[in-house]
Amino acid sequence: MNSFQALILGLVQGLTEYLPVSSSGHLVLLQKIFGLKENVLLFDILVHLGTLVPLLIIFRDEILAIIKKPWGRLPLLIIAGTVPTALIGLGFKDFFERLFVSGSTLGIEFIITGLILWLAERQKSGRKNLEKTTFLDAIFVGVAQGLAILPAISRSGLTISGALIRGLNREWAAKFSFLLSIPAILGAAVLDLKSFVEQNANLAGIDLMPFIVGFFAAMLSGYFAVKFMLEILRKGKLTWFSYYVWILGVTILVLQAAGKF
């Protein structure tokens, strides 16, 4: 992997982690296009950590409130949502990893993501804020986040859609989705790091510059993606993303049918 490839992958990771178009699906797609196979796991760890930084900056007030009052309503809702995510992720880890490697279901999953966004956009605007959100709501969104481990199913798309279906207002749905992603991203990074160590991998002879470039590219693009997504949710424009992932999904299916993917 060279620095240019790392820059593209980092920018795409940061944007697609928070825009509802599936970061994992785009990374699998680009890695196939670039023909990348070596040190992909370590790169994935770093770019995911890079996308975490914007959340820590943008939602610093909420995070500080959680630290000061760890048994308040918000942290308990996040815990309730994180448990099903962890159970699904750990329970089906090997299955999900096989799908990542093959990329055989990317087209179908992009189309499913578009359908979910399209249906969510047609939900009536909810009125639930933090105080009115129940633990059942949080668990529902957490299950959605767990299912989004599939390669081209958008995590932000599925969790925001799940929150809207449960009646959360748009601004709170986006905020809860982003806050719920923090333990998920951290947990995934820890598991990937464990796998990296178990593979007896080391950094000897590895050019670290592409990894540094990827980290900062993901961090910067992720920041703008979160800000943009919060604005989009206020305006109710999720269907824009539906059309994009539908076109992408159909294109992949056509290429697969032609034996060119």
Swiss-Prot record:
This is Undecaprenyl-diphosphatase. The chain crosses the membrane at residues 39-59, 76-96, 99-119, 173-193, 206-226, 238-258. The lineage of its organism: Bacteria, Bacillati, Bacillota, Clostridia, Thermoanaerobacterales. Catalyzes the dephosphorylation of undecaprenyl diphosphate (UPP). Confers resistance to bacitracin. Keywords: Antibiotic resistance, Cell membrane, Cell shape, Cell wall biogenesis/degradation, Hydrolase, Membrane, Peptidoglycan synthesis, Transmembrane, Transmembrane helix. Belongs to the UppP family. InterPro entries: UppP (IPR003824). Its main location: membrane. GO terms for cellular component: plasma membrane. It is an enzyme of class 3 (hydrolase). It is a multi-pass membrane protein. GO terms for molecular function: undecaprenyl-diphosphatase activity. Bacitracin is thought to be involved in the inhibition of peptidoglycan synthesis by sequestering undecaprenyl diphosphate, thereby reducing the pool of lipid carrier available. The keyword Transmembrane helix applies. It catalyses: di-trans,octa-cis-undecaprenyl diphosphate + H2O = di-trans,octa-cis-undecaprenyl phosphate + phosphate + H(+).
